Amino acid sequence: MMDGFAQDWPTLTHTDNGLAMDQLGGDLPLDVGFEPQTRARSNTWPCPRPENFVEPTDELDSTKASNQQLAPGDSQQAIQNANAAKKNSSRRNAWGNLSYADLITHAIGSATDKRLTLSQIYEWMVQNVPYFKDKGDSNSSAGWKNSIRHNLSLHNRFMRVQNEGTGKSSWWMLNPEAKPGKSVRRRAASMETSRYEKRRGRAKKRVEALRQAGVVGLNDATPSPSSSVSEGLDHFPESPLHSGGGFQLSPDFRQRASSNASSCGRLSPIRAQDLEPDWGFPVDYQNTTMTQAHAQALEELTCSVADELTLCTQQQQQGFSAASGLPSQPPPPPYQPPQHQQAQQQQSPYALNGPAPGYNTLQPQSQCLLHRSLNCSCMHNARDGLSPNSVTTTMSPAYPNSEPSSDSLNTYSNVVLDGPADTAALMVQQQQQQQQQQQQQQQQLSASLEGQCLEVLNNEAQPIDEFNLENFPVGNLECNVEELLQQEMSYGGLLDINIPLATVNTNLVNSSSGPLSISNISNISNISNLSNLSNISNISSNSGSSLNLNQLQAQLQQQQQQQQAQLQQQAQQQQQPHQQHQQQLLLNNNNNSSSSLELATQTASSNLNARVQYSQPSVVTSPPSWVH
């Protein structure tokens, strides 16, 4: 054993490159390429580009390849060349740098007649693109087939042609007139469509028509948002107030912030400050006169009706109480602004020539508000009693064509006298007239109030005795007593009518075997007519006063008892001939005929019981329908 260890060790083995295996240790430096490389955890496409990547200049553009018409044998070579040209770059898709549109372009271009159906495009993808070779089944092909259909309809380089054969899919061909590159996105071109341009043109034409016609509308101060997109920010392009060009805005108008896409808030009609001062009086202040009568009329309108009555009587008594020569003093004038006083003194066309301060003026008189509804003549008589030359009714010159209404008759008459002698004579005459007028007014007022009260009372409560029952046409009145009684019972339920009709029912059952005579029918109809007339007369007689239900119930019971007695007498009179007739029939007929007769009598009696049964208080108004 030990001798084996003493032998020499085997020689070193050499590698292919002449280096011993032991020398491959730490003496030689390791290559940098063997170091571990960092890798992203996600394997999604596209892969991240390296840091030192430079895009090659001679790269094959997909847009150039998409519009090239390739030969059938060059399609695979073109794909390989495209992949080889971009082997250093990251791939856009899992199968390479070509998009779906590029693959479809190669597929259509590889066909002999330059057209393929949708199913043929699918087959070309599976056969020529390695990525889709194992994805041809229906389960794994749903996604990329949907993408192919989407690209066919989206890009303008593809054109759909109807197939000549029936039941076959359409052909897809390359559009020679298509622009190179990708088609313009439809969403980006939505703001510059022809419809938008037409709308702008229509709006401008409408504005020009308004400018020419000179129409001033309600919204003229604000510009139209549709037609002011291309206009400047400092002009009103839509204003029809100015026929030529845009209207330059004043600096009082401020602008609002807006975008280029929307023009709704370009110009604001809100003024920065108020341009017109508030003068505090109406526009026609130069022609108006604030008179004493107008001021007092406004004060009187705020008072109540009772205060107006007392003021009217007090003014009539105080206005002409100076029979002994002592004139009454007018009330102090109300406050007036200075400009109104000057306008009154300068421009009043109704003022008389300067009465002296010592002259007397009569107390103003107005028409009371309550006398407007009545035919009151207090104001008319007062105006007629005065001389027309001495009365001045002050009206506002701003309304020269207006006629004073009953509300505006609260004006006063300023009577200016010429001397003390005429004053005394006129005062005595007017005092007498005024006393007479006052008495007449009081009489008219009392009479009118009494008449109104009586009229109201007569309208509210008319006596029922005025209703004439004698002239009432009773003969033409049709009344169903049975329905009337049923209605009354359904409303109140106070009527309790008990009619013992057992004897009548038994007599009618016994006599029902024979036929009813015409006299019975006529008697029944007469009884019903009499009962109707009696009920009508009773109802009409009780209509003048309040209806008493107890009296009506008693009357109905009496009438029904009388009808029962009459029916019993008629049944007794007709019972004997019916019995004789029944005996003859029983003797002549056999057993079969007797049984049929019994059935007939039973049916007749049941029908009669059904017709003449008094389950509710009712009166027979017509013969039964089964009687012929």
Swiss-Prot record:
Modified residues annotated as Phosphothreonine in this record: 44
Compositionally biased region (Polar residues): 63-77, 221-230, 256-265, 402-414
Compositionally biased intervals (Low complexity): 338-351
Source organism superkingdom: Eukaryota
Modified residues (Phosphoserine): 75, 190, 259, 262-263, 268
Subcellular localization(s) per the UniProt record: Cytoplasm; Nucleus
Region (Disordered): 39-77, 182-205, 217-269, 316-359, 389-415
InterPro entries xrefs: Fork_head_dom, TF_fork_head_CS_2, WH-like_DNA-bd_sf, WH_DNA-bd_sf
Keywords, ordered alphabetically: Activator, Cell cycle, Cytoplasm, Developmental protein, Differentiation, DNA-binding, Growth regulation, Nucleus, Phosphoprotein, Transcription, Transcription regulation
GO molecular function list: DNA-binding transcription factor activity; DNA-binding transcription factor activity, RNA polymerase II-specific; RNA polymerase II cis-regulatory region sequence-specific DNA binding
GO BP terms: cell differentiation; glucose homeostasis; negative regulation of cell growth; negative regulation of cell population proliferation; negative regulation of insulin receptor signaling pathway; regulation of DNA-templated transcription; regulation of lipid metabolic process
Positions with biased composition (Pro residues): 328-337
Main location, first listed in the record: cytoplasm
GO cellular component: cytoplasm; nucleus
Segments of the chain annotated as binding DNA: 95-201
The protein's role, per its UniProt record: Transcription factor involved in the regulation of the insulin signaling pathway. Consistently activates both the downstream target Thor\d4EBP and the feedback control target InR. Involved in negative regulation of the cell cycle, modulating cell growth and proliferation. In response to cellular stresses, such as nutrient deprivation or increased levels of reactive oxygen species, foxo is activated and inhibits growth through the action of target genes such as Thor.
Subunit description: Interacts with melt.
Name of the protein: Forkhead box protein O
Organism the protein comes from: Drosophila yakuba (Fruit fly)
Gene of this entry: foxo
